[in-house]
């Protein structure tokens, strides 16, 4: 007698969907899309046109998800050896390397077509360059080659505000580059704080993160210096007349908080401070760009 079919006797479609979704790093992409949206809004003195808004966000999100999936694919060996990442879909065998590559290629191609057709070729090619910068230049080479991997590779991750700007204007602007500078300077202290917390794991898999190659104390000093540089960069939108009083106040408070956390990390020997700095940096960037957005509409 034939055995009745049951959901448990086949791979779960729901679990498979979740595995592919996880490979796109949705939380990272969500924060990135906030910076894209802010770039779009600051580029326009009026309400955003619907077509480049929707197509731009969708296309950029898809290509960012593609880059994240390629990151999962390239890092699958070291991910399986680190406590933070061992449960990812590829190390656990929930997705094969071939399917991960096909998924990343499909997602990236669809995103590129959407951007090229419904926004403009400039944004499509800039987003493609960011994908190559993150997935191939940073993940496949820089990450394993130099302790300055985050600094050099951070440029690709700093591009989203510029992508948002070009999506609605089809041109470069100096104001968009200011936003790129802010994220570029934010990236090293954000990742170095995590690298301090996970130093032993990075050393185990031979990834030359700064705390591994130069020591924790040197890295703490670099984090503090970068937060000071970041605080100065965060004032640039005010100095060039791009933003007003609301942003100035919010930026000053956030920068003070970030510097204070970095100072604590440097001069207080307390367990868990590195992860506190890491988490604070996420809120810092999110709230900073929300302040840019609110200021733009309240003081326009």
Curated annotation (Swiss-Prot):
Tell me one GO molecular function of this protein. protoheme IX farnesyltransferase activity
Q: What does this protein do?
A: Converts heme B (protoheme IX) to heme O by substitution of the vinyl group on carbon 2 of heme B porphyrin ring with a hydroxyethyl farnesyl side group.
PROSITE patterns tied to this protein: UBIA (PS00943)
The principal localisation class reads membrane
Enzyme class, first EC level, given as a word: transferase
Q: What is this protein called?
A: Protoheme IX farnesyltransferase 1
Database matches in CDD domains:
PT_UbiA_Cox10
Q: How does it sit in the membrane?
A: Multi-pass membrane protein
Show the catalytic activity: heme b + (2E,6E)-farnesyl diphosphate + H2O = Fe(II)-heme o + diphosphate
């Amino acid at each position: 007698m034939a055995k009745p079919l049951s959901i448990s006797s086949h791979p779960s479609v729901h679990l498979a969907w979740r595995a592919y979704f996880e490979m796109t790093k949705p939380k990272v992409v969500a924060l990135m899309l906030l910076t894209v949206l802010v770039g779009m809004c600051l580029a326009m003195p009026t309400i955003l046109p619907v077509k480049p808004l929707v197509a731009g966000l969708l296309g950029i999100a898809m290509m960012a998800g593609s880059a994240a999936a390629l990151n999962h694919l390239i890092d699958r060996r070291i991910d399986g050896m680190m406590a933070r990442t061992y449960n990812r879909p590829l190390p656990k065998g929930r997705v094969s390397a071939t399917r991960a590559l096909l998924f990343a290629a499909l997602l990236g191609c669809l995103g590129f077509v959407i951007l090229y057709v419904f926004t403009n070729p400039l944004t499509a090619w800039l987003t493609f360059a960011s994908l190559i910068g993150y997935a191939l230049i940073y993940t496949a080479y820089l990450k394993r080659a130099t302790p300055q991997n985050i600094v050099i590779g951070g440029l690709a991750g700093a591009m989203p505000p510029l992508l948002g700007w070009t999506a609605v204007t089809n041109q470069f602007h100096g104001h968009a580059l200011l936003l790129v500078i802010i994220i570029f300077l934010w990236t090293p202290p954000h990742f170095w704080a995590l690298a301090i917390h996970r130093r032993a794991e990075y050393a185990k898999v031979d990834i030359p993160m700064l705390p591994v190659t130069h020591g924790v104390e040197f890295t703490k000093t670099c984090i503090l210096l970068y937060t000071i540089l970041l605080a100065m960069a965060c004032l640039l939108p005010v100095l060039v007349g791009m933003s007003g009083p609301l942003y100035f106040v919010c930026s000053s408070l956030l920068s003070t908080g970030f510097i204070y956390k970095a100072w604590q990390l440097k001069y207080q020997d307390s367990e868990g401070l590195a992860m506190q700095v890491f988490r604070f940096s996420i809120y810092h960037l999110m709230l900073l760009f929300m302040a840019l957005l609110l200021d733009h509409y309240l003081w326009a």
